Amino acid sequence: MRQIIDYDCNFKEEVGEVLKDISTSQNTLGFNVISILGCQSTGKSTLLNALFDTHFKVLDKLTSGYCQTTKGLWLGCGTESFNSPILIWDVEGTDSLERGEDRATFENRAALFSLAVSDCMILNIPLMNLTTYSSSNFGLLKTILNSWFSLKLDQNGITRGNIRKTTLLFAVRDITINDNDEMLGRKVVQILDLLWRQVAESQNSLGNQIPASFSDIFEVKVYGIPSLPNDYDGFKQVVAAIRYDLTTSILPKDYTRRIPLEGLEMYCKTVWKCIVDCQELNIPSQIKLVSRFRCEQAKDDILDGYKKSIKDLQKKMEKREFGFNEFSDCTLLVLENSLAAYFEVASKYDHEMSTNSSISLLVFIFHEFQNAVNSRMSLERQDLRQYTNILDYYKKGIEDHQVQYDKENNEESHYVSFDSSSWVNKELLKFDSLSLKWKTEFPSVISRQHLISPIKEKCIPDILNEISLSSQGKEVFLATYNTQEQRKLLSETLEIHSKKIYEKLVEEFFESLIKDILKEISPLLGDHFLSDPKLKLDDFWELTGSSIVNIHRLLVSKYEQQWITLFKNSNMNEFTSSGLEEEIALQLVLKFIQLIQQQSKYFHINIVDRFKNEFELDQDGVPRQWIGEDAKTMKELFIKAKNNSLQITNVFYPRKDQLIPLSGRFSNLFDKIIENSEDLSGIIALNKGHGNGKFLDSVPLISESNLKEIESKASQEITSIFSKAQLIQSTGRQPQNIPWWIYLLIIILGFDEITYVLTSPVLVTLLLLLASFIYSYLTGNFSSFCNYSQQFVIISTKILHYISGAIHSSLDNRK
């Protein structure tokens, strides 16, 4: 026996200590709860001990007299002659002198608590008080009837017959031989009818729905019990009859509040707390509250037990140790065992609460399964994204097509193209097909508990992809998992690869195009310009324009089909916005401009060559002999050849129509050339800044400063050539040849080394001084060092002057 609620209304958490005496499983509804109410010192505890073989403390008149024995609420367990455990609440007696005027508060709380937790309430009433109001506790009974409405027990279906009604067992004590149960029953019912009419009137004014009679909400049993001291045998006989009726008809098979034995302590605690805190005591809500708590607790216990199994599954998936069948078998086993363990506990609680918690359990488990599948699909995604041979595949398709095209030259051609969308979708289809093979079979308990629809609502599409019914051999539900996160990553990777493939193909296309352009335009400057000194600039630009047009037509014909094939399914708008013809025209002119600009670095050589061809050769191409030539004629010839050769620098300042022979076909071609050539745009901007430039009406390909530098270099060499011609004309002979010993010295030491030393007289002198110092140091004759040093300086100066003059003279002659 344990005191659960003490004298000061504090709930002591010792219900579990009482339940330890029960040998049956704690997860059961197969028990009943009985409470007893009545006035103090009327034998309540004695009756309980006789009925249930309990050991509640009873009144000892000899030692303590008539006083309060039971304080608060005590709980005991009785199993004697009962098929299932009986939990008995021995409630402190009412109308006690010890509590005084505050007794009503505790009495009402105790009565309401007893009504909330009991299958059967025993009302212990002495026969002599049956016709009184206060002593018979009928005032308290009226409170109980009123409290029934606040408990909202009708929401559990009591008035509809779905759940057994609470039994009010009236134990009328100390009856005589003239009193019988029938007479006592009529009296009790008469009193109850009177009380019910009063309660119904007050509840009707509050708007509550009133049952027709108290019998709609309570079962009433009345037993007359003889006095134990006066009629021991009669007392025992009636007690045995009550016990028999309790076992066979009064007590239900299961606890009417649908709370398993293990959840009873929490239920009683929350009920008492609501009563003490003066909160609304809604019994269905309290039942749901306890059910929710215990079901969530059971769910957490299940998850704690299966976390290791789930983690092992995830590790095996990450290590590729599980195939499709192993994954399906393992997940089915986890679901079967976890749900079986869960419903073993939760099935005893409120169905709605147990279902909700089971859905929460399944959502967590499916989410962990999804993580395992995503981990595995991450590895598969990394395998699928290795596309190093895609570009080779594309090229091979082009080559195969070319072979087929050669065989069917007269038939309509079918060109292979790289379709980005088709390729990406094809690879994603492989991923989806693989993802759908990771399936989980639902155990039969999911169907029995009608959980398919809630699972679909909670898990699709975030966790599960779909739930399908398979009819192969047996009807089972199969779930596949949402792998959109990995699919999205793969799609992004594919898009990047696709773009890289196009970029590579475009790069190779333009590399091939530029290579052919350079190959075709390179001879233009040599053939038309360098080899023919008589060619005029207008003729040069006419021939060059004609060649560029022909090259353009040739390249368009060559690359047209490749262009169409490459960009047919491309989203690269920066390339497809302009047509092939305009693109080739743009690249042709740009590369030709670059070629001319590159020639500018050595263009003074071209000017000198043209000068030589005109100045040193006659009309028949025979070298001129300047000996005896008239000086005036030589000068006129020199001026003419020089002016003619320097005029070719105008090639760097052509007109727009000369530079762009295709401008008539492409109106905005010049603007694109300026846009794509930073050097050209900078030169144009620079020349516009010089208002006195002589080529403002032309397209400048080089700056004026570079042009002046070219003319200066060419003029120097032209002047040197003319000077040598004058020397020959005046002396009648060629410049002196190089001495033999100079050649020998060049062979032994090297021309570059000798030139470097000779162009540095100070270095030669320092070397000679160093040699004389070393000699003097070794011999100890430092006076000779000073003499030798002076002589070396004088001799080296003379020798260097002579050798330098000879070499420069010979080199000038070779030029």
From Swiss-Prot:
Keywords, in A-Z order: Coiled coil, Endoplasmic reticulum, GTP-binding, Hydrolase, Membrane, Nucleotide-binding, Transmembrane, Transmembrane helix
Gene3D superfamilies: P-loop containing nucleotide triphosphate hydrolases
Topology Cytoplasmic: residue spans: 1-737, 783-815
InterPro entries: G_GB1_RHD3_dom (IPR030386), P-loop_NTPase (IPR027417), RHD3/Sey1 (IPR008803), Sey1/RHD3-like_3HB (IPR046758)
UniProt superkingdom: Eukaryota
Stretches of the chain found on the membrane's Lumenal side: 759-761
Binding-site residues, GTP: G38, C39, Q40, S41, T42, G43, K44, S45
Main enzyme class: hydrolase
Membrane topology: Multi-pass membrane protein
Pfam family, one: RHD3_GTPase
Cell compartments where the protein resides: Endoplasmic reticulum membrane
GO annotations of cellular component type: endoplasmic reticulum membrane
Sequence ranges assigned to domain GB1/RHD3-type G in this UniProt record: 28-260
Keyword Transmembrane applies: yes
Entry coiled-coil feature ranges: 298-321
A GO molecular function held by the record: GTPase activity
Function: Probable GTP-binding protein that may be involved in cell development.
Protein name: Protein SEY1 homolog
Lineage: Eukaryota, Sar, Alveolata, Apicomplexa, Conoidasida
